[in-house]
A protein has these predicted regions:
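Hydrophobic h-region of N-terminal signal peptides that target proteins for export
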Residues: 1-5
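Aromatic-residue-lined binding/catalytic grooves and analogous aromatic/hydrophobic interfacial grooves
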Residues: 6-197
Length: 197
C-alpha cells in the first residue's frame, strides 16, 4: 500500500506572503528581524541613541568553560559583539523585510545624504554572517566598525547593570577585555577566557 500527496502550491509565492516587514527601522533588539542557523545568529536594528545600524553577532557555542563553578555563572553563553554601520548622513527612515523563503533580511536605510540598501543572512552550514550593501553616491563613504562585548557572564553583567546585589556573584573573576588587532588586512577580535575555550 502506498500513499502520496501532490500539491501545486507555489511555495516561494506562498512563503513571501508570510514575510515579516518593517515600515520603520526597529529601534531595539526585541523589535528586530532575527536570522540564524541553529548556532550562529544575528539581528538588525537602529542602534539606540546613535546614528547607526546594528548587526549583532551571536553564537550559542560561545560560552564560558569554568568547571570549578557549578552555578549558572560558570557555563553561561557569552556575548560576542556587534557591527555598526555608520552612514555619512543622518538616518531619516528605513524599511526591512525578513524573507522566509531565502532566509535573509533585506532593506533600505534612507539618510539626509542618500540611501543604503542591505541584504543579510546567516549561512546554513558555516559560521558566517554575510551583509551586502549598495549605497547611493552620497552614502558611498559609510563605514563599518566592530564593537566587542564584555566577555563576562551575562547574568553577572545584568546584576551589575541593574545594581541587583542579590544576583551579583561576589567571587566572580572577570575574563580579560577583548583585544582588537589587524593582520594581513583583516581586523580581528581576540576574546580570551580565563577557563579557555
Amino acid at each position: 500500500l502506498t500513499a502520496g500527496c501532490y500539491s501545486q502550491t507555489d511555495w516561494k509565492s506562498f512563503m513571501s506572503r508570510q514575510d515579516m516587514t518593517w515600515t520603520r527601522l526597529p529601534q531595539t533588539w526585541y523589535e528586530a528581524p532575527f536570522m540564524g542557523n541553529g548556532s550562529m545568529g544575528s539581528y538588525i536594528c537602529k542602534e539606540p541613541g546613535k546614528n547607526a545600524i546594528r548587526v549583532d553577532v551571536g553564537n550559542s557555542m560561545v560560552h564560558d568553560h569554568r568547571t570549578d563553578d557549578a552555578s549558572i555563572y560558570g557555563r553561561g553563553r557569552l556575548l560576542i559583539g556587534y557591527f555598526l554601520l555608520h552612514p555619512v548622513g543622518e538616518i531619516k527612515s528605513g524599511d526591512l523585510r525578513l524573507d522566509l523563503w531565502n532566509a535573509e533580511t533585506t532593506g533600505c536605510i534612507r539618510t539626509t545624504r542618500g540611501a543604503i540598501k542591505l541584504r543579510a543572512c546567516v549561512t546554513s552550514e558555516s559560521p558566517y554572517i554575510l551583509v551586502e550593501t549598495e549605497a547611493t553616491a552620497g552614502e558611498k563613504e559609510f563605514t563599518w566598525k566592530f564593537y566587542p562585548e564584555n566577555t563576562d557572564s551575562p547574568r553577572q553583567l545584568n546584576a551589575i547593570r541593574k545594581g541587583n546585589k542579590n544576583h551579583l556573584k561576589k567571587d566572580y573573576v572577570s575574563n580579560p577585555a577583548p583585544q582588537l588587532s589587524a593582520r594581513n588586512g583583516l581586523n580581528l577580535c581576540w576574546q580570551i577566557l580565563l577557563a579557555g575555550g
